[in-house]
Amino acid sequence: MAKRHIILATVLLTAVVTARAQSEWVNPFIGTSNHGACNPGAVTPNGLMSVSPFNVMGSEMNTWDKDSRWWSTPYVAENKYFTGYSHVNLSGVGCPDAAALLTMPTRGNLQVDYHIYGCEYTEEKASPGYYSNFLANGVKTEVSATTRTSIERFTFPAGPANILLNLGEGLTNESGAMVRRVSDTEIEGFKLLGTFCYNRNAVFPIYFVLRINKAADNDGYWKKQRPMTVEAAWDSDQGAYKLYDAYTDELAGDDIGYWFSYDNLAPGEQLTIQMGVSMVSIDNARENLDKEQSGFDFDKVRQAAEDKWNEHLCKVQVEGGTDDQKTVFYTALYHTLIHPCIINDVNGQYPMMEHGSRKGKKVGVVTSGERYSVFSLWDTCRNLHQLITLLYPEKQLDMVRSIVAMYEEWGWLPRWELFGRETFTMEGDPAIPVIVDSWYKGIRSFPVETAYQGMLKSATTAGRKNKIRPDIDPYNKLGYIPLGYFQADFSGDNSVTHALEYYVADAALARMAVALGKPDDAKRFRTRSLGYKNYYDKEYGTMRPRTQDGAFLTPFNPRQGENFEPVPGFHEGSAWNYTFYVPHDIEGLIDLMGGEKDFLNKLQMVFDEDLYDPANEPDIAYPYLFSRVKNEEWRTWKTVHSLLEKHYRNAPDGIPGNDDAGTMSAWAVFSMMGFYPDCPGDPYFTLTIPAFDKVTITMGNGKKLEIVKEAAANFALQAQSQAMSRACSARIGGKKVKSYRISNKELTEAGSIVWK
């Protein structure tokens, strides 16, 4: 008996010793290749501040360069030339912006041209809230972050050294900055960011305060001078970087920076810098830094960041599966917790939505909770906000409040908001399904009537003055939008895409009207949401654009538009990528296609002939639509399993394309847990076999949901015959499911889902 106790104790001790915190499963290098647009830098959950290695400029040894093409990420795995750390970076986004305020440690003589001071690097390490590398110039670099501040520790060999702040470069399309020396260890200033996704008016300043732990032997500004010719060429600094070592007032310009130089550091001496940022003012940036960091304690900040990540990631516990699957899962969950990000300062101030000044002020104040920004709603309305609602409802409440406040400040609900500016990127009216989904899932402590008025405004305002639905007139009159109304050039006219997004939004708006006791509105918008039928062409069996005379577009190729090829009527996809995108009325689409058999055959063909695009949003829910036909759920299980294995991997290219502010990662999280929200604004989930033997979810309501996969379910996934695949079934709360599409209430109150 004693021997048995010893063995049991040894087993338990081993289990404790070998247990890994969730953050240890995260690989921040996933998504840093294959246009994933993620970066491995330090960030805290939904933090404004992020610190990323910047390796996309300065050398021909780089595979990708920010100035040679449209490039939207500060870091790419294939590149090898490091030019500093960028601050406040976007994650998984397809348009370049931010990623500025570049800090760089160098050795030897002072150089301020990044083509010269940049260098190669090795020994990269990254974990949630931490990144480090070893530079070819002999410096070890480490960075970490809080919500609004960064800390960077540089360990130097003996000899002369420099710390640079480059305000001229970054991913933003804007130029212009200012920096001011405050003391021998502190500088302050701002840089202009913006022109995101071609929107010339989406421009905003970011304010900063930078401190260093040791006064420099020499410090000063730099600015690149304009090149001169003929008589004016007498200036020896013309066309070059000019050092201002005796100038102490503030300096402004386009290509400017600040430097701290040290004559002779001791071997292993560390220089540490901190930076606080704000979208409101320099004073707020300083207050953020004072409140979020005391002293220059790098290890304390790093540990706090790691602890914060573990608090968030532990909401989901998984057992079984491979180590790679666990890494893919927790990295995906990590990526869903980067955007939207907190934009208010520690004092509650935030930049009001553009044009908010018409009410007499530009700065708002939150008195409770947080104000959020970076709402890539065309993407995230499909799954990310549903995930936040399930696991972190207090965050989703603040996000909904932020969205509604933007309507109050600006007059419209946002579509793609960035740092207090509407960028008008992508299509549709996606704030509506986000708000409606949240309401139906119990998030209601926000001004719902105000939100409803915002929904009505974009859904009913006529003409071009409708900022969210500028082509609403034909949509109202005809039930669809013909080519040539939104844009004369058919190749850039996304009429079908626009309308399909409006149908989904209108269906959600109808649900909101039902909840608020407005039956006439509910009927009106539900009817309008069925206008997609005007686009269905039986000849091709797909959605097909119509011209202004009502005829179908001719000639027409339903496959045109693959790989982002321009195509009339559709944005970033072909007709096949959009044909099934009527998730609010799949039953109606089945009838339109001639019945369940034809529907299944067409949907299966999309996957069999590689017409499905796993790297973009329009068809992201397609795998789950098989389950709308009884006894065909097995197709969902096998298709989802196959897509996860093929496109989500523990490697830099382990996301199939742009992560789109966490949307692709949210697809993986839901799919690996075993359920998915297949219709924006509709509080339902479609079940699938999970990737793990057991998933334990601690939901925001405090309840737990256990999802268990028994051996028979694995067999069903691997089975070659339909009969064997169909043999598997799920039980919810001990009862066999009648439908594999269940309500949010059923899911959150189930207690258990067991696959047998």
Functional labels for PLM-detected ranges:
Residues S721-G734:
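Surface-exposed interfaces of beta-sheet-rich extracellular modules
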